Amino acid sequence: MRLDKARNMYKNIAGTFISLFKSRSEALTSARDADPRTFVESYFYPLLGVFAITLFVGRLIHLGTFDVAELLRYSLAKLSALILSYYLISLSFRYLFEKYFNKSFTIAKMQIYVGYILSVDIVVGMLIEFSFPEFLEALSLYIIVLLWEGSRSFLQLEEEKRLANTLMAIFVFFGIKWFVSFFFNKLIL
């Protein structure tokens, strides 16, 4: 019974992730109406769990030796940076969208928006961790497309405000991710 439930959950995660590429407008529109608790429990946190396992195993493959302290330090630094980025980006987006675009969202709704966009970065990170070519990191640029589409589908901004919103969101998203990753790399790794 539990195995079937887990299998269905991960099948739904894969389907949701694929829909971000296949029909991003529909995916982001449905994300607007999603229940925040369901999103976190059945999509984002399980995806983080898979990411943590991938970091651990990927680092084990790269090291070639089983050094638990090094594996945990690396995995926890990367995972902590991702989670902190998730919350900081959500808070920043909520504040900036309310202040500059008169769009008020709860933190939970903004976490859904950021979570869907960040899931692309998570999957790219998993692929790179397993020695796929580093050029796959360019897939992270798809986040720009999602931010552009999200300004229409999720945030429902007027056409003339979309470009300003997207540029600000790109700067905030990548800036926070870079700063947090830099901080954790210097602090822990």
Where do the language-model regions lie?
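Selected alpha-helical membrane-embedding segments in polytopic membrane proteins
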Residues: R2-F105
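Membrane-interface junctions
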Residues: S30-R37, Y113-Y116, E129, L157
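Alpha-helical membrane-anchoring segments
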Residues: R37-F51, Y113-I117, D121, L163-I170
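Alpha-helical transmembrane segments of polytopic integral membrane proteins
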Residues: I53, I89-R94, V120, I144-W148, ...
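Transmembrane helix-loop junctions in multi-pass membrane proteins
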Residues: F56-A69, V123-S131, V180, F184
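Alpha-helical transmembrane segments of helical membrane proteins, especially in multi-pass transport
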Residues: A81, S85, A108-L147
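Terminal transmembrane helical module of multi-pass membrane proteins
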Residues: L127-L189
